[in-house]
Amino acid sequence: VYFKCRIGRIYNAMEKIEVIQEGAVTSCNIGVSKEEWLELLKDSATSKHYKEALIKVFYAPQHRGSCISICNKMGGNPQSLNSYITKCGEYVQKKLNRFQIIRPNGEPCYWLVPMAEGKDLPKNSEGTFEWQLRPELIEAIKEYLYWHLVECYKSLRKEIRIDDDKWNELYKWQLITECQDKDLISIVNKVRVTNLVYTPLVSPTLDFVINYRRKEFEKAVQSLADRQVLLDKRIQDFSTTMQEIADVPDNDKQNLYANDERTVSAILTCIDPNAYTTYKYGLYKSVCQYLNIQPKKAGKCYSHFMELIKPLLYIVENDKELHDLVAPSISNYVQSDLLLSQDILWVLFV
């Protein structure tokens, strides 16, 4: 069904959506799904300025703010942000070609396409008008940020291989391969001399418990690897046990018992590289910042990191181009999409 507008152009018949005004709040429902927003974000035809503008709002507290408050936090020009959001809304509306948002005066409204609502702010506020991103767009941006990491990683790996001499990350695959079918003590003995742990302090402590508290330590590692128990509880129990059995006599300067989450992650990864991957707090903190998520307290960071990596893992598992790209470097070693996911985060954030 078609109709002609006054200026003579022919358009597909589309829904006219009226703006809802409730006091100072302006809103409307446009029915654009998360999947549609994600497709638009991935589309190379969508201006990078539009994507950057949307992501700036995403990074604002609770994904809302005025142009001034957002730019004060993220940088940039408030007028440019306003312009890009408006132009983005116009672009999306034309791209989808199924609705028009109309103001009470009959004029089109474009900023409401990406925004769930907007409201006037009281005097002396940081700005005069506040936006709130649509929930479907928020979820799409979360997925897009993961997808974008994989795309950046593929571009990088086309130039620098995993086993490149100047930036060699192959040792991680070599380590998990060497640990296959080894007993727990042998695995820890290999882990303790790698940079996956804080070697100067952790390595001597692990060496001590292996040689002088072997039975107790082996039992502690067995409990740590028991997947029937929640990871946070296992880490807590391992930490407590290690403070008891790794207390080196006559060492009043000892302040690390090889029970930190980084050490735990390295041990677990080498025991089961398809269930765990390596962790470092600095990397975890950067990932949280990138995803606009608050880090957890000590003792819960590693389990949180493992949760945050799951969406990335799903993309990695289903990306044939990525696997074909890294295969020449790692095909002779134990395969772990979790380790590949960790490598993506490591090379892009550290």
Could you tell me what each predicted segment is?
Residues 13, 142-257, 273-350:
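An N-terminal alpha-helical hairpin/helix-loop-helix interaction module that forms a charged
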Residues 23-43:
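Short, Lys/Arg-enriched N-terminal segment that forms or immediately precedes the first helix
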Residues 49-57:
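Short alpha-helical "packing" element that flanks the helix-turn-helix/winged-helix DNA-binding module
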Residues 58-62, 272-274:
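Short helix-capping/hinge SLiMs at alpha-helix to coil transitions
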Residues 64-72:
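Short acidic, hydrophobic short linear motifs in intrinsically disordered regions
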Residues 70, 81-95:
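DNA major-groove recognition helices of helix-turn-helix
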Residues 107-147:
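Phospho-regulated, low-complexity intrinsically disordered regions of nuclear gene-regulatory
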